[in-house]
């Protein structure tokens, strides 16, 4: 890979880091920066695979926000449709969207080659009349050993030491959190539950991390950026960091995200739905969300 180059500062919340080796963005207004390539919002260009069932992610022109964004508004976005009564993709009425995103070939190759630290980011906007119900999932980073990295969610217990999944969630009233699936050990549990303003274990499911550290707002563009730093084998020095609109809201240090050198950052689990998996989580009406300006960089 190329040598590090100065990147965006926090003034551009898609890239809240000081330098990177290699990166991409689908943001059409991103400035020309060495080693940052612009790619279309397209399945082939972004290495999209394992699309969930019949769920679509059509590229559309999103509606205008209820107030201007501090950045140029995206002209193209994936549209997620949450049908009335929909919740988990495994239920009778599926909703949202779901797939895995590896990024362009050069970035995917760098990740599979053993990159230790990366950031993935996107902008999202919820319907202006959004109803939260009990909560739902939003895209986040994932990784692990080979195909064991997939489906590191849904209450999975087997081979949990060989994967991690760091999707986000919204909760009642728009409270945000990282819904963390990590190797099952006391070190990770202690770190994740200590992130302010508070955490919660969810039986065999993920750990709610930093619930209420920020609030989503319907009808406006929100920029999400997530950083994963893998731990050295045998050390508890992994990190997960999250920025919302350029502000760091969660920074978990001292994690064990892997126990084997072959466990890698894979990209993004680009999934969103209402749930939970029971009807009390379901969307009360047809609702929509839009996802745009998908980006990713390898730091080292």
Regions found by a protein language model. Name each.
Residues 1-222, 226-300:
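Low-complexity, Ser/Thr/Pro/Gly-rich disordered linker/stalk regions
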């Amino acid at each position: 890979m190329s040598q590090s180059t100065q990147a965006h500062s926090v003034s551009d919340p898609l890239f809240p880091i000081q330098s990177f080796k290699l990166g991409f963005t689908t943001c059409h207004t991103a400035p020309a920066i060495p080693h940052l390539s612009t790619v279309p919002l397209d399945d082939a260009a972004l290495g999209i695979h394992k699309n969930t069932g019949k769920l679509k992610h059509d590229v559309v022109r999103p509606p205008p926000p209820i107030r201007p964004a501090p950045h140029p508004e995206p002209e193209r976005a994936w549209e997620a449709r949450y049908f009335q009564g929909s919740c988990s993709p495994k239920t009778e009425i599926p909703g949202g969207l779901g797939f895995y995103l590896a990024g362009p070939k050069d970035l995917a190759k760098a990740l599979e080659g053993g990159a230790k630290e990366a950031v993935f980011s996107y902008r999202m906007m919820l319907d202006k009349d959004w109803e939260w119900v009990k909560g739902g999932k939003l895209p986040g980073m994932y990784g692990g050993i080979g195909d064991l990295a997939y489906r590191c969610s849904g209450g999975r217990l087997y081979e949990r030491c060989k994967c991690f999944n760091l999707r986000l969630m919204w909760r009642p009233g728009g409270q945000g959190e990282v819904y963390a699936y990590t190797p099952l050990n006391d070190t990770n549990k202690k770190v994740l539950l200590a992130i302010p303003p508070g955490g919660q274990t969810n039986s065999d499911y993920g750990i709610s991390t930093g619930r209420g550290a920020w609030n989503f707002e319907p009808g406006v563009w929100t920029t999400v950026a997530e950083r994963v730093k893998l731990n050295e084998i045998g050390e508890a020095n992994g990190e997960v960091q999250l920025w919302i609109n350029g502000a760091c809201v969660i920074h978990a240090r001292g994690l064990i995200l892997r126990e084997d050198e072959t466990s890698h950052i894979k990209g993004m689990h680009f999934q969103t739905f209402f749930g939970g998996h029971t009807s009390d989580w379901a969307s009360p009406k047809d609702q929509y969300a839009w996802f745009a300006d998908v980006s990713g960089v390898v730091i080292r």
